[in-house]
């Protein structure tokens, strides 16, 4: 998916090929042929192409993936509507790209520009839609469940392998199942579990109140676990966000950070494979020609592939580029310390050169995006607010304590047998799985601490300054912690000789599994009674039209079926996260101005947005037909939509006579009065 999808995007973005179904299929076939050729070349050179003895494992992992995919797909069918939260944006992006033969597509909420956001995640959904000849109405939901399945299987596969590598020689009898148990735990921790907020506020505190005879005031609402700091207790000057994958998968958004989960987990797994290979090769040979030596350092396949993925992250979710550049850098540095046997100058020289190599290649491959993208970042500032200690303890106490316990366990075990105590000797003594788990855990702790120190400035300064920074950093911290805990718990239970560590690990496992109750609570709250098959609604993401916009549904569906390309369809603009822009979001057809706060974030040009908002009002309410015609010409408007939202916003000021005089009515609903005017072009 990454290779064929990204290659297709590059060819379209540099205007070599159009973004059509035929191109998606053609590129995929070409990549398939190339893989077949490479396969035969490798066979001729005696290179193993299939992992010997692993086909049964691969088959089982594919079955596991399919099972998790079916589970989430079944659940999604109880609430498939792409309406609410960020869904209008996510679905609208997909519809806009389905209509477009160029990328970036025309911005559905800013018709005079193209999409100025990290649209890579929605692009991959559209790529798969065009590749398979499917419809966005269905693939919107299939993509969210597809990602959820990857979010389970990738951690499972990585942690299972790490545990098997670490317990090599100890897996006799029933212990042979431990790697799989660790993998399942990691998959659960990353994609299904909640956090300790659920345990405290859904289980423990209500039980205490019940014992005290205090009546329960409110039931537990699953988004509370993601809106805690700044909300309980209320602090209007520091509202924050700390979401995690299970919440995202239940809610059903297809936002940048969600889709990229499948790519970041792949990158983490690849980094482990690289570190394992480096350790197997042993120290770098002393005597090498300088040119050969540096070419070897710069052209390592794993580093090159990591660079391409990091570059891709700038387009799928820029925050992940920064986060995983640091993670990749940490892995490279540790690997170089071992490869060059603690020789500081050589370690620093190679690490710096490889870092430059990674940055250079990552920026090069994504130039078709960055050259057309205006950043939303306005700098970095010191955090003026900080989380309460007990809030951090509730949200992050479990993974941090287990990570610290793992680090202490690993270090104390290895330090006892070291004759020469140095960083190199210590790292050399630690096994690759232990070392990699420590790196993941330390990176995750850093991601939790950063929002307590600094934040990235954007438009959310008043009361929400830390929100976006905390959201994007701790989302990845949760993923890294999940894999660290999945590995660390079983590693300490089996290997540690200290009873207290085994006890604490067991307690940690119990608490972690307790947080899985969040999944059940969230599913019941959001999807309803999923045991009643009769309430299954299917996967059509647009069923909300008849439910929530019955007066406009038939008109919107007429546009979807009859309008080709991306002509401008004017509709009333409104605030973000409301029912406004239901036309553009459902069809992908651009309007003059859409959700205000979103375009403010993407464009950061408030005067321009206010001018467009005023012009839209003039078009709908003015009695001066000539003024209206000039505005229609300025914005190249082809159709004017008059429905429920327009009547609600403009009321008696809505001038139907002028609007209908601008062209011909191509659709009219006699029951609701909704109509569409096709503007006559002068």
Regions found by a protein language model. Give the residues of each.
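Start-transfer (signal-anchor) and selected internal transmembrane alpha helices
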Residues: 16-74, 163, 167-188, 294, ...
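Extracytoplasmic
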Residues: 510, 520-682
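Membrane-embedded, hydrophobic transmembrane alpha-helices
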Residues: 1-56, 358, 362-414, 443-451, ...
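Hydrophobic/aromatic-rich transmembrane helices and adjacent perimembrane loops
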Residues: 145-148, 324, 465-492
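Membrane-helix boundary/interfacial segments in multi-pass membrane proteins
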Residues: 14-18, 82-87, 111-113, 132-133, ...
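Membrane-interface alpha helices of multi-pass inner-membrane proteins
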Residues: 248-251, 304-316
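Active-site lumenal/periplasmic loops and adjacent helix-entry segments of GT-C-fold
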Residues: 52-266, 546, 569
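Signature aromatic-anchored transmembrane alpha helix within multi-pass, membrane-resident enzymes
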Residues: 303, 350-363, 421-428, 492-523
């Amino acid at each position: 998916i990454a290779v064929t999808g990204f290659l297709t995007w590059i060819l379209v973005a540099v205007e070599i090929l159009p973004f059509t179904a035929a191109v998606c299929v053609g590129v995929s076939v070409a990549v398939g042929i190339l893989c077949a050729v490479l396969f035969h070349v490798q066979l001729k050179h005696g290179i193993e192409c299939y992992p010997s003895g692993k086909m049964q494992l691969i088959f089982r992992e594919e079955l596991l993936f399919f099972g998790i995919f079916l589970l989430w797909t079944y659940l999604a069918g109880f609430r498939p509507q792409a309406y609410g939260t960020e869904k209008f944006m996510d679905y609208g992006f997909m519809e806009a790209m389905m209509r477009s033969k160029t990328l970036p597509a025309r911005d559905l909420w800013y018709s005079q520009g193209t999409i100025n956001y990290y649209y890579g995640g929605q692009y991959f959904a559209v790529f798969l839609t065009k590749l398979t000849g499917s419809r966005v109405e269905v693939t919107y939901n299939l993509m969210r469940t597809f990602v959820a399945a990857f979010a389970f299987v990738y951690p499972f596969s990585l942690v299972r392998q790490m545990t098997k590598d670490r317990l090599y020689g100890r897996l006799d009898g029933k212990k042979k199942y431990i790697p799989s148990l660790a993998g399942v735990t990691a998959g659960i921790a990353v994609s299904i579990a909640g956090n300790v907020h659920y345990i405290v506020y859904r289980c423990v505190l209500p039980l205490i109140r019940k014992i005290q005879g205090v009546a329960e005031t409110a039931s537990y609402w699953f988004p509370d676990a993601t809106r805690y700091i700044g909300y309980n207790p209320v602090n209007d000057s520091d509202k924050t966000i700390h979401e995690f994958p299970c919440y995202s998968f239940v809610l059903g958004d297809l936002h940048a950070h969600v889709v990229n989960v499948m790519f970041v987990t792949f990158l983490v797994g690849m980094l482990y494979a690289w570190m394992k290979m480096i350790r197997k090769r042993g120290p770098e040979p002393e005597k090498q020609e300088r040119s050969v030596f540096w070419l070897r350092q710069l052209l390592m396949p794993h580093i090159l592939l990591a660079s391409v993925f990091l570059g891709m992250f700038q387009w799928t979710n820029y925050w992940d580029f920064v986060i995983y550049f640091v993670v990749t850098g940490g892995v490279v540095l540790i690997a170089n310390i071992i490869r060059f046997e603690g020789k500081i100058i050589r370690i620093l020289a190679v690490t710096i050169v490889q870092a430059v190599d990674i940055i250079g290649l990552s920026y090069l491959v994504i130039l078709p995006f960055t050259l057309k993208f205006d950043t939303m970042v306005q700098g970095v500032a010191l955090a003026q607010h900080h989380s309460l200690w007990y809030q951090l303890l509730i949200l992050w106490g479990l993974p941090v304590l287990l990570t610290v316990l793992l680090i202490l366990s690993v270090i104390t075990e290895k330090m006892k047998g070291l004759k020469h105590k140095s960083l190199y000797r210590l790292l050399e003594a630690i096994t690759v799985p232990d070392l990699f788990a420590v790196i993941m855990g330390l990176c995750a702790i850093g991601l939790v601490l950063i929002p307590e120190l600094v934040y990235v400035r954007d438009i959310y300064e008043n009361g929400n300054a830390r929100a976006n920074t905390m959201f994007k950093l701790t989302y990845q911290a949760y993923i890294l912690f999940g894999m660290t805990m999945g590995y660390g718990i079983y590693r300490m239970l089996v290997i540690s000789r200290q009873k207290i560590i085994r006890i604490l690990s067991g307690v940690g496992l119990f608490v972690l599994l307790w947080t899985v109750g969040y999944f059940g609570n969230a599913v019941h709250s959001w999807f309803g009674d999923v045991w009643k098959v009769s309430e299954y609604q299917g996967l059509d993401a647009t069923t909300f039209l008849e439910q929530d916009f019955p007066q406009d549904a038939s008109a919107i569906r007429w546009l979807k079926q009859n309008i080709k390309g991306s002509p401008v369809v004017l509709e009333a603009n409104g605030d973000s996260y409301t029912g406004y822009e239901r036309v553009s979001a459902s069809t992908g057809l651009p309007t003059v101005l859409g959700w205000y706060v979103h375009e403010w974030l993407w464009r950061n040009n408030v005067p321009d947005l206010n001018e467009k908002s005023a012009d839209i009002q003039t078009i709908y309410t003015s009695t001066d037909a000539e003024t209206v015609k000039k505005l229609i010409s300025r914005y190249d408007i082809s159709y004017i939509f008059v429905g429920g939202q327009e009547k609600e916003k403009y009321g008696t000021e809505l001038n139907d006579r002028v609007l209908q005089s601008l062209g011909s009515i191509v659709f009219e609903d006699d029951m609701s009065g909704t109509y569409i005017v096709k503007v006559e072009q002068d």
